[in-house]
């Protein structure tokens, strides 16, 4: 039994030792040849073909290097698994770089991409010292640890203690792993699980080995039998954790409750050479609860050591010691074996054996224990071997009770993985049995955690991401400028993720030091000024040596040199240009033939040049200065920026910021150029841009192309004409423009991707680029079908180009299939006028067209067809010319053509306005024409004869109409006439602006103003037609109020068009007002609707109003007044005729202005415009009755003025203050009264004052009352005329001795004159008889105001007449009896509204007069009485008392020349007057006069309180009194009027005057009110 137990010992020892030595040998070889990987740096390590190894971080990742890596390659991921053990540093990481660990499948060197990357940073946690050991398991092709770059470049600094860690790696086969590899892997697993917890799970997920207590178990004897890759425990399959028994035992003997303790360390080798033996032991801990139960297995094991041979002289003596074993069975269990084999007991008599050692101390201080003793066998070469055991054991009893320590129960099964896919966690737990009898508690973890990785997550796309950049490489140049590079790797995408975006390499400039530079001469400077200006001298120039630098050699040669100068003769005084101050610059004296130069202004760089020349007589004179070398600061900056970008493009650097430069140049060029040098600078910038576009590092964008073309268009603007002419004088600079455009077409056609067709339309050129294959080419026409130009001038192109498809044939079949052609066509709008070919006899008579084909064809089998439209009228000998710089001067060609040539083109005239050119070369083409000897160059923009005739005829007819209306204005003044005058003015202004706009197309400011005003006057003409219709409608409906309506008419006629134009200009900022071809609204952008919309609205509203007026005219209850109906019909007919004709006129005007070349539109406009003028004159002048009557009256007035019949002969100059109406009627009536009063019939005078209509209430009153007996006459017919009339039937009135007028003063505000004498009784009776007789000669002269005679209350007892308030122009004819003998002093009568005959109530005979009042002291009459207020017709006549001061006897009128027929003629003017218009509204003026009355009452009360009224002077005239009020002379109180202070009872027949008829009232009548009198309905 002892031999059997000892036999397996050498096998168990030698096999692992041999495998371990083999691994150590491979490890040593790997360490010597570690740097065999593909890395490009020394700190890159690739390990492959090795199964075990070790390295430290200090060796693999040195402190002075970054981006170092260590890579372990798996021989075959399907057969092997990589394991790694990392011993972390005790301190946290402190170095600048972080070490990352990950596995990957492969690495693509071309894109620096890692495929299948999986990081282990979460598993290892190298910078976390809380877990000293970390383990991981990798199953992919490569396992790599890489040190990342620190955040900033520079010195990495010393490596901290926390950055030093050590790594062991192991490659284990998945099937049949070696025993030694399993031993090491099981120990790693034991340590991994022992140190695992929730925050640090174990990184070893599974092993192919059967692990048991940290060792590789024997599959034959172990109860844990591995089958394949699983271990069985109690017949249940599990993972590698089932192969472990105890993970908490330590070498100190504190472990589980029973079983073997851990092995001790290996002892010293028994021999120094020749092969020795090392041993180690372990102790057995008895199982709890099983008394006397031992452990199975050996207590001690050994291994060979120091097997190297000993020296020849060395004698070795050895102590042999065999492996011993013990049996854990009890003594009773041995039975007969003790007798058969013998129980270990002391042996004596063996000479070779030493004595037994003393028994050891009992192994247990409590309970049953063991004691051992040993002995050694000392043998020699001549002695025999020892017999018997060398070690003995015996039981020792102890009566003390042993403490029972806490014991762990079995581990629970591992939990499920925390994640269904990807990396997760698993854990298991165990419980501790509590200790007894003072035993120790359980030691070790209660829970273990490890990683689990069931399967990769499907369908979750992982995008690729870049790793950090590597450090910059060393500079490529040891001095001066060099380059550095750095790279980065991409962690490739997974499951369809996106690739890494960006570059994996970066380059930067580096500079280590300056290289030595030898000195180098710069170019010679320009020669200095000559020492003398003439007669021979010298001039000097010098050069500068640049360098040397950084130790280079100096320049060789002279620094300056001299030459002779000034050999010409000195000029005479007349050959020298004097000093001149021109253009704010002082030009010094300069000889003829030389050029003076001064600096450009502050906003530019360069020089201003001015040449001094000799005239034909040999006298020196200054030529105009040229600014060809002056370049503005902005253009100079753009030019320098472009040159910098070109330099970068030539070095192969990518172009950044080129688009911004083009955009900046576009913005600057839109503001115009200041100097001719700006043009050349811009061309230079565009040429450099073309070279940049040609480079492969920059591809032009569509925005760049558009900006490029727009810049060229800005250069060709009309504002730059003078600068182009100046540039042409210095040289043929136009050829640079042609070359620039040709190169641009070439570059764009072949550099832009996906370019098919491109059209660029600007204000001054059109660019068309076509890219097409040669195999499928067709004829190209310019413009192509479906042309949609945005510019007005190019919308209807007048010039055409046809390129035959035969041009694109190369003649080679192979080349035709792959050839691509680019065709560029450029139409220059006004370049021809810039090319300095205008002479006295020749001119470029077309636009300029350029045709380019790239690559250029060998020849043109079919010539180009180009059709040109002529630009000038009156030209002959149209000749096709082309731009050809290679064509030399020809004797047959005109010398002034310059680079233009007529060779290669054939001219085919089409018509008077078009010419076709057939050319066999590709170039730039135009038409050269000969001016007629008697013709001047007539630009199409000059107004044509048709427009001039149409506008002139219309304007003249309308102007004649205005003159007629002005001449008879006082007869026809009305709203309708005002509207017509404004309407005519708007049409006349529109015609003038049309002609002006045709000549100002080149002046942008004037053209914009013309377009805006033309827009305004066109709309105003429509609005005035609408105003006329509105006025007619208001008159028909009876809502016409003169002052208010006239203001609205003006707002509609002028205000509405002004508002529309102001809004349009404000919103568009005047863009669209005027174009390059005409001064009118642009057809683009919708601005034209600002005219069409309002005009259409006016037409629609006018139609609606016309329908309403027509409905009113034809209805039964419509207009009753015949004359008003006739006028309404005339106005409606005028609108129906004029409005359509006006719309047609302006439509044809817009077409004629926008399309100048269409003769049809111009003829239509001329016809419509002329017809419009005639129709307006016909409708509003010839066929209008009012105008006819007004003209007749005007002629009669002229005749009467020639005969002396004027109103200027009135008394006291009153005619100068009266209106025309008052003059005529007053003169007529006074003539009739003075000549024969019977001849003045009622029909003659009342017809003049007849109103066309009365309010309904007044009509009812008149219908109910008795027939009227009062008739109206003008208010200014003086009573003096009746007083002295020889045919007045009354005759002189007798004087009544008993009549008197009593001045009553009572509480009333004003005094009243009371008539109570016989004269007033006589007046009452005569008044009654006059009503009964109703003779034709009875009449009443009333003021033109609308006074009303109303019936008085019956209870009033007296007839009170207020003499003070009696209007001075009121006269009542009482009787025609021949026996009447009282004077013509009449009481006032009241007038019904509107001057109609009043309704007179019956007059009752007055009661007997009351007894006379007591006598009083007579009060002297005041020096003057307040004059009566002048009514509308009362112009202020003198007092009714004739006297020397009245002027009645001093001035006589000759009225015999005025007949009744003259009055009949004059009455027609005023037949339609409505005197109700004087006040507009009765209510308004009643309120106004009530206010005035209150003021007068207040003034009267103050006057009554102040004593000495008789001595007070007359009050000063108030400001609101009219001028004619000052002409009223004061009059005294009549002699037959008595003043009484006591109050008298009112008379029942008292006639009360209206408030505004009182003496103190003042009618606020202004000039506008007087005009309202003349208003027509």
From Swiss-Prot:
Positions with biased composition (Pro residues): 1385-1430
Extracellular compartment spans: 34-944, 998-1004, 1070-1089, 1154-1162
UniProt PTM: Proteolytically cleaved to produce vasculostatin-40 and vasculostatin-120. Vasculostatin-40 is the major form and is produced through proteolytic cleavage by MMP14 between residues 317 and 325 with cleavage likely to be between Ser-322 and Leu-323.
Family annotation (PROSITE patterns): G_PROTEIN_RECEP_F2_3, G_PROTEIN_RECEP_F2_4, GAIN_B, TSP1
Record region (Disordered): 310-331, 1378-1469, 1499-1544
Region annotation GPS: where it falls in the sequence: 880-935
Cell location: Cell membrane; Cell projection, Phagocytic cup; Cell junction, Focal adhesion; Cell projection, Dendritic spine
Main location per the UniProt record: membrane
Region of interest called N-terminal stalk following vasculostatin-120 cleavage which is not required for signaling activity, as start-end residue ranges on this chain: 927-943
Disulfide bond annotation, renumbered to this chain: 269-305, 273-310, 284-295, 362-396, 366-402, 377-386, 417-452, 421-457, 432-442, 475-510, 479-515, 490-500, 530-565, 534-570, 545-555, 880-917, 905-919
Protein's recorded name: Adhesion G protein-coupled receptor B1
Organism: Rattus norvegicus
Gene (name only): Adgrb1
């Amino acid at each position: 039994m002892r031999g059997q137990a000892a036999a397996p010992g050498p096998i168990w020892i030698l096999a692992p030792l041999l495998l371990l030595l083999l691994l150590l040998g491979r490890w040593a070889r790997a360490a010597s040849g570690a740097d065999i990987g593909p890395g490009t740096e020394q700190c890159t390590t690739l390990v492959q073909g090795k199964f075990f190894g070790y390295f430290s971080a200090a060796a693999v990742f040195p402190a002075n290097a970054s981006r170092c890596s260590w890579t372990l390659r798996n021989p075959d991921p399907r057969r092997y698994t990589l394991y790694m053990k990392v011993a972390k540093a005790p301190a946290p990481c402190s170095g600048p770089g972080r070490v990352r660990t990950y596995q990957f499948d492969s690495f693509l060197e071309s894109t620096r991409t890692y495929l299948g990357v999986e990081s282990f940073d979460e598993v290892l946690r190298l910078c976390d010292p809380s877990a000293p050991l970390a383990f991981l398991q990798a199953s992919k092709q490569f396992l790599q640890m890489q040190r990342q770059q620190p955040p900033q470049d520079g010195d990495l600094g010393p490596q901290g203690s926390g950055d030093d860690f050590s790594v062991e790696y192991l490659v284990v086969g998945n099937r049949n792993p070696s025993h030694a590899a399993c031993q090491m892997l099981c120990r790693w697993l034991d340590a991994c699980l022992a140190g695992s917890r929730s925050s640090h799970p174990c990184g070893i997920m599974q092993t192919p080995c059967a692990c048991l207590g940290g060792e590789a178990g024997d599959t034959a004897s172990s109860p844990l039998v591995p089958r394949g890759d699983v271990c069985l425990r109690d017949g249940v399959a599990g993972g590698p954790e089932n192969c472990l028994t105890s993970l908490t035992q330590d070498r100190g003997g504190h472990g589980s409750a029973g079983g073997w303790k851990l092995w001790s360390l290996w002892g010293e080798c028994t021999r120094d050479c020749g092969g020795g033996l090392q041993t180690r032991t372990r102790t057995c801990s008895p199982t709890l609860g099983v008394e006397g139960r031992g452990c199975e297995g050996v207590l001690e094991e050994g291994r060979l050591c120091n097997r190297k041979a000993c020296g020849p002289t060395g004698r070795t003596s050895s102590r042999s010691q065999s492996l011993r074993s013990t049996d854990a069975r009890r003594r009773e269990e041995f039975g007969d074996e003790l007798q058969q084999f013998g129980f270990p007991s002391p042996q004596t008599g063996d000479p070779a054996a030493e004595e037994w050692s003393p028994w050891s101390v009992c192994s247990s201080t409590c309970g049953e224990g063991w004691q051992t003793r040993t002995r050694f066998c000392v043998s020699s070469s001549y002695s025999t071997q020892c017999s018997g055991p060398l070690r003995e054991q015996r039981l020792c009893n102890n009566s003390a009770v042993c403490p029972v320590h806490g014991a762990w129960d079995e581990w629970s099964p591992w939990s499920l993985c925390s994640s269904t896919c990807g990396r997760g966690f698993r854990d298991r737990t165990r419980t501790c049995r509590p200790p007894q009898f003072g035993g120790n508690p359980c030691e070790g973890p209660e829970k273990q955690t490890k990683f689990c990785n069931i399967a990769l997550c499907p369908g979750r796309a992982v995008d690729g991401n870049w790793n950090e950049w590597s450090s910059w490489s060393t500079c490529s140049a040891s001095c001066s400028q060099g380059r550095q590079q750095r790279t980065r790797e991409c962690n490739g995408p997974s499951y369809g993720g996106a690739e890494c975006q960006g570059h994996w390499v970066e380059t930067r400039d580096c500079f280590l030091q300056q290289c030595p530079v030898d000195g180098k001469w710069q170019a010679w400077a320009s020669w200095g000024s000559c020492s003398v200006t003439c007669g021979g001298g010298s001039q000097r120039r010098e050069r500068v040596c640049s360098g040397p630098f950084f130790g280079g050699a100096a320049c060789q040669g002279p620094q300056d040199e001299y030459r002779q100068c000034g050999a010409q003769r000195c000029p005479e005084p007349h050959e020298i240009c004097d000093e001149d101050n021109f253009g704010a610059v002082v030009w010094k004296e300069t000889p003829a033939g030389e050029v003076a130069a001064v600096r450009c202004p502050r906003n530019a760089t360069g020089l201003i040049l001015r040449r001094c020349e000799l005239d034909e007589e040999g006298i020196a004179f200054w030529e105009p200065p040229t600014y060809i070398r002056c370049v503005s600061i902005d253009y100079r900056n753009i030019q320098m920026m472009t040159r910098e970008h070109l330099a970068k493009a030539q070095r192969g650097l990518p172009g950044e910021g080129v688009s911004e430069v083009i955009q900046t140049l576009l913005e600057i060029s839109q503001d115009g150029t200041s100097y001719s040098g700006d043009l050349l600078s811009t061309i230079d910038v565009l040429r450099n841009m073309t070279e940049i576009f040609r480079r492969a590092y920059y591809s032009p964008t569509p925005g760049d192309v558009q900006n490029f073309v727009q810049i060229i268009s800005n250069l060709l603007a009309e504002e730059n004409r003078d600068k182009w002419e100046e540039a042409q004088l210095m040289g043929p600079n136009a050829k640079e423009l042609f070359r620039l455009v040709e190169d641009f077409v070439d570059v764009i056609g072949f550099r832009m991707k996906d370019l098919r067709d491109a059209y660029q339309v600007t204000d001054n050129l059109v660019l068309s680029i076509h890219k097409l294959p040669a195999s499928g080419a067709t004829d190209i026409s310019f413009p192509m079908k479906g042309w949609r130009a945005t510019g007005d001038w190019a919308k209807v192109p007048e010039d055409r180009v046809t390129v035959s498809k035969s041009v694109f044939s190369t003649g080679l079949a192979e080349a035709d299939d792959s050839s691509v052609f680019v065709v560029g066509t450029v139409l220059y709008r006004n370049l021809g006028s810039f090319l300095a070919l205008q002479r006295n006899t020749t001119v470029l008579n077309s636009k300029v067209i350029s045709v380019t084909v790239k690559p250029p064809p060998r020849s043109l089998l079919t010539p180009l067809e180009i059709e040109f439209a002529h630009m000038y009228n009156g030209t002959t000998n149209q000749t096709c010319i082309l731009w050809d710089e290679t064509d030399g001067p020809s004797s047959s060609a005109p010398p002034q053509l310059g680079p233009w040539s007529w060779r290669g083109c054939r001219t085919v005239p089409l018509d008077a306005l078009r010419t076709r050119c057939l050319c066999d070369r590709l170039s730039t083409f135009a038409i050269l024409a000969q001016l007629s000897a008697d013709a001047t160059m007539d630009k199409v923009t000059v107004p044509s004869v048709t427009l001039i005739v149409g506008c002139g005829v219309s304007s003249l007819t309308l102007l004649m109409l205005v003159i007629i209306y002005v001449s008879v204005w006082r007869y026809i003044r009305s709203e309708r006439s005002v509207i017509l005058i404004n309407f005519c003015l708007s049409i006349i202004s529109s015609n003038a602006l049309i002609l002006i706009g045709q000549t100002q197309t080149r002046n942008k400011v004037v053209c914009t103003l013309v377009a805006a005003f033309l827009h305004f006057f066109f709309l105003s003409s429509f609005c005035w037609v609408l105003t006329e219709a509105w006025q007619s409608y208001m008159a028909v409906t009876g809502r016409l109020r003169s002052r208010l309506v006239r203001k609205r008419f003006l707002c509609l006629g002028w205000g509405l068009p002004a508002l529309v134009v102001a809004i349009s200009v404000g919103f568009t900022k005047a863009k669209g007002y005027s174009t390059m071809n005409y001064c009118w609204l642009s057809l683009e952008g919708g601005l034209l609707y600002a005219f069409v919309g309002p005009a259409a609205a006016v037409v629609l509203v006018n139609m609606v109003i016309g329908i309403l007026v027509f409905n009113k005219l034809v209805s039964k209850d419509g207009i009753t007044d015949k004359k008003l109906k006739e006028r309404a019909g005339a106005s409606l007919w005028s609108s129906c005729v004029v409005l359509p004709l006006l719309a047609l006129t302006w439509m044809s005007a817009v077409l004629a202005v926008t399309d100048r070349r269409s003769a049809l539109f111009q003829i239509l406009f001329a016809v419509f415009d002329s017809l419009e003028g005639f129709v307006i004159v016909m409708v509003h002048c010839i066929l209008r009755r009012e105008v006819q009557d007004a003209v007749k009256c005007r002629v009669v007035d002229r005749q009467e003025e020639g005969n002396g019949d004027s109103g200027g002969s009135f008394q006291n100059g009153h005619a100068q203050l009266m209106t025309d109406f008052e003059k005529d009627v007053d003169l007529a009536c006074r003539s009739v009264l003075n000549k024969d009063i019977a001849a003045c019939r009622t029909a003659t005078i009342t017809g003049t004052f007849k109103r066309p209509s009365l309010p309904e209430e007044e009509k009812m009153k008149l219908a109910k009352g008795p027939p009227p007996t009062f008739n109206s006459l003008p208010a200014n017919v003086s009573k003096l005329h009746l007083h002295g009339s020889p045919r007045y039937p009354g005759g002189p009135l007798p004087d009544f001795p008993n009549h008197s007028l009593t001045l009553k003063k009572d509480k009333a505000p004003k005094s009243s004159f009371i008539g109570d004498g016989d004269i007033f009784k006589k007046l009452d009776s005569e008044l009654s008889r006059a009503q009964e007789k109703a003779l034709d000669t009875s009449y009443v002269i009333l003021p033109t105001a609308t006074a009303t005679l109303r019936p008085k209350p019956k209870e009033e007892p007296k007839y009170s007449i207020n003499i003070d308030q009696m209007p001075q122009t009121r006269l009542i004819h009482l009787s025609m009896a021949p026996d009447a003998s009282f004077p013509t002093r009449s009481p006032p009568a009241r007038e019904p509204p509107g001057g109609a005959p009043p309704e007179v109530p019956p007059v009752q005979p007055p009661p007997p007069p009351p007894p006379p009042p007591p006598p009083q002291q007579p009060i002297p009459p005041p020096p003057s009485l307040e004059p009566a207020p002048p009514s509308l017709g009362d112009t202020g006549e003198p007092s009714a008392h004739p006297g020397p001061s009245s002027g009645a006897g001093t001035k006589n009128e000759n009225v015999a020349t005025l007949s009744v027929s003259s009055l009949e003629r004059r009455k027609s003017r005023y037949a339609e007057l409505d005197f109700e218009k004087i006040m507009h509204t009765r209510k308004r003026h009643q309120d106004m006069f009530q206010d005035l009355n209150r003021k007068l009452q207040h003034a009267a009360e103050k006057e009554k309180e102040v004593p000495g009224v008789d001595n007070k002077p007359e009050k000063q005239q108030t400001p609101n009194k009219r001028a004619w009020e000052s002409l009223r002379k004061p009059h005294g109180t009549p002699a037959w009027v008595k003043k009484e202070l006591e109050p008298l009872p009112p008379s029942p027949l008292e006639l009360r005057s209206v408030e505004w008829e009182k003496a103190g009232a003042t009618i606020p009548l202004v000039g506008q009110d007087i005009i309202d009198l003349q208003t027509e309905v």
